[in-house]
Amino acid sequence: MDEQIIFCDGFEVVPSPEINDLILYECDQSLTNSEVTTDEEEDTIFSGGDSSSGLAAEEDSSGDKPLSFYIVKQPVYDNPEIKAKIDEANQEIFRCNELRINVLSAKKSELAEVSSLYTQMESLVPQSEGYRMVIEEKKKEFDTLLEALRNLRCTTSDQLCFTKEELDHLSYIAQYQIEYGSIGLEEEDWMLKETEKPDGIILSEKEASINRVKSMALELNEVKNELDAITWKINDLSDKLWKSQNNIRVLDLEKAHILEKRDRFYARIKMLRIQRDKGNAAFFQSLSVMCKAKELAASGNVRELEVFASSEVDRFMTLWNDDKAFREDYVRRISHSLCERELNEDGRIKDADLQIFWEKKVPVKTIKRSEKVHKMNREDSSSNSSEDGNVITDKRKKETKSDVIVYEKPKKKEEEIDEEALKERKREEQLEKARLVMERKRKLQEKAAAKAAIRAQKEAEKKLKAIILSCSHFFNECEKKAKKKAAANSTSPSESDQVINDEKVRTLAVSGKEKHQKERLLFPKQRSFRYKHRGSGTEALPKAILNRRKARRYWVWGLSSAALAVSLVLVVLLLR
């Protein structure tokens, strides 16, 4: 095919001034006549002609313009939440692997200890068996010697004893015969003669056999002690072996738990990746579209490729215009790739002048933030950061004066300072929020406690009021009953009651006069200009009214006051 096909994907196609050089570069990399080559940075695809070696010369000679087609590319979107969860799960898997390695190393050490204990026990077991064989042989010799001694004792006399128990038994029998039995004088003389007979040969044999028995007993004791020491060592080693085996079982259980935990995290990562792939369904669909377009470009079918590209663009634009969610998803996907390629949201290259302008502003902010942070924490580092900032600004002023405009990013030190300052601010804000939340909770708790106390106090007051009202009602009824009884019983008051009432009236009148005189002595010059109108009533009650009064019984009031006091004391005790 004479025409060249340029297949472009991305947000915007920018025509290059040196397209022939690009075609030459791409055609050198092609392997076959109809092979498709890709440039990932520029997202372009070129298809070759008949021969790869003479393609550039033919294009230069012919001067045919290449055909370009536009297809929208859906980039991969890595959800930060899913990415954070996957990173966290990977960290947990790394920790599980570290724990598994530690458990395996501990298990290896325990197994080595078990093997060493087994070797020690294997070396001690034959020694113990040899000592047991020696003990058995010694016991046989000892038994033969004891039998020989017993035979000698039986041949000579029955009175020869080799043990303390036999001697005690014989002495007991002799004492019993002396106390309860009857022995003649001849027999006693014969027993004395038998004891006084000299028998040197038999006694020497007995002494030799006794010495051999003693030596055999000492040898047996030594062998037994050695055997006991070996058995103690074997028991100690068996205890250590049992402990190490228990430790190995515990480590196996811990290893199984760690592996189970790791498998859970692997399953979680798998689910998160499936979720991420579901979110990137548009990207996989765009991959299939791109593969189909590459096949069409490789085959050289321009008409079908043009129809396919236009249909894909129309489909994308309909989705862009109709579906808001699709539009937001595409913007979210394309923003990261635009930042990497230094493009604006509309696909154009960022202006260098604006970049330099923003670069001039950013270091000043970083220096201010660094100065604030270092004033609070480090005063020395603030001066160093300010000097670095001044040097950077001077360099950037010189670069703006030069002909070639170069984009320079702020230095890492300033970025680190900004990140540290932001982290400290965030931490302070979080601490302040936590403090405010704690204060709010404390105030709410105090309010709730105060409300509960007030509520309890009100309930107690209500109970007291109810008790007092019931008591007063009861006492009023008692008074009414007493008054009715007194009115029925007494028709006229007694003389004693009249005398008491007269004395009360006199005391009241005397006290009123004394008060009036005291007030005059204290305030002699004060005179009131108001006229005092006296009432028509008398100060002292007449005798006729006094005679009409009923006699009150004071024992009723005493009982009522005592009952009220008792009820109040009971209420106070119940509240406590």
Curated annotation (Swiss-Prot):
GO cellular component: endoplasmic reticulum membrane; plasma membrane
Keyword DNA repair: no
Membrane topology: Single-pass membrane protein
Entry annotated with the keyword Electron transport: no
GO biological process: regulation of proton transport
Natural source organism: Arabidopsis thaliana
Compartments, as annotated in UniProt: Cell membrane; Endoplasmic reticulum membrane
Protein's name in the database: Proton pump-interactor 3B
Main location: membrane
Classification via InterPro entries: PPI1-4 (IPR055282)
Biased composition regions of type Basic and acidic residues, renumbered to the chain: 369-381
UniProtKB keywords: Cell membrane, Coiled coil, Endoplasmic reticulum, Membrane, Transmembrane, Transmembrane helix
Region of interest (Disordered), ranges: 34-63, 369-395
Family statement: Belongs to the plant Proton pump-interactor protein family.
Task performed by this protein: May regulate plasma membrane ATPase activity.
Sections of the chain in a coiled coil: 132-155, 205-241, 411-467
Residues spanning the membrane: 555-575
Name of the encoding gene: PPI3B
